[in-house]
Swiss-Prot record:
<dbReference type="Pfam" id="PF10664">
    <property type="entry name" value="NdhM"/>
</dbReference>
<keyword id="KW-0521">NADP</keyword>
<comment type="function">
    <text>NDH-1 shuttles electrons from an unknown electron donor, via FMN and iron-sulfur (Fe-S) centers, to quinones in the respiratory and/or the photosynthetic chain. The immediate electron acceptor for the enzyme in this species is believed to be plastoquinone. Couples the redox reaction to proton translocation, and thus conserves the redox energy in a proton gradient. Cyanobacterial NDH-1 also plays a role in inorganic carbon-concentration.</text>
</comment>
<keyword id="KW-0813">Transport</keyword>
<dbReference type="GO" id="GO:0031676">
    <property type="term" value="C:plasma membrane-derived thylakoid membrane"/>
</dbReference>
<dbReference type="InterPro" id="IPR018922">
    <property type="entry name" value="NdhM"/>
</dbReference>
<protein>
    <recommendedName>
        <fullName>NAD(P)H-quinone oxidoreductase subunit M</fullName>
        <ecNumber>7.1.1.-</ecNumber>
    </recommendedName>
</protein>
<keyword id="KW-0618">Plastoquinone</keyword>
<keyword id="KW-1278">Translocase</keyword>
<keyword id="KW-0472">Membrane</keyword>
<dbReference type="GO" id="GO:0048038">
    <property type="term" value="F:quinone binding"/>
</dbReference>
<comment type="similarity">
    <text>Belongs to the complex I NdhM subunit family.</text>
</comment>
<keyword id="KW-0874">Quinone</keyword>
<dbReference type="GO" id="GO:0016655">
    <property type="term" value="F:oxidoreductase activity, acting on NAD(P)H, quinone or similar compound as acceptor"/>
</dbReference>
<keyword id="KW-0793">Thylakoid</keyword>
<comment type="subunit">
    <text>NDH-1 can be composed of about 15 different subunits; different subcomplexes with different compositions have been identified which probably have different functions.</text>
</comment>
<keyword id="KW-0520">NAD</keyword>
Amino acid sequence: MLKCTTRHVHIFAGEVTADNNFVPRDDLFTLDVDPDNELVWTDAALQKVYARFEELVEEYRGRDLTEYNIRRIGSDLEHFIRSLLKQGEIAYNLQGRAPNFSMGFPQIPAEEIVGQYIPKG
């Protein structure tokens, strides 16, 4: 099975059926965004990720379906998610089971810092 797994993006070449089985396919991708719920999403931000995914898949149309190409799509999508975080469209889920600032420390305006420790870069 061809797949790409990054911290916030899982892509599989195939589909999940109604009875929760996975069927490999060469003509369909399944996307799982932020499976560990490390980020807080709005519907609008999630739709942007899905739209960017569709654009990336379209850009690769006609190329061989290889693990390398799927990983490139996943990597590009991970960078896109990071840009959403930096723009403030999504945020870290500080209530998650294991908060992890894998995309950099949160950007907090200085006037909002009250008794918080912000590491010096």
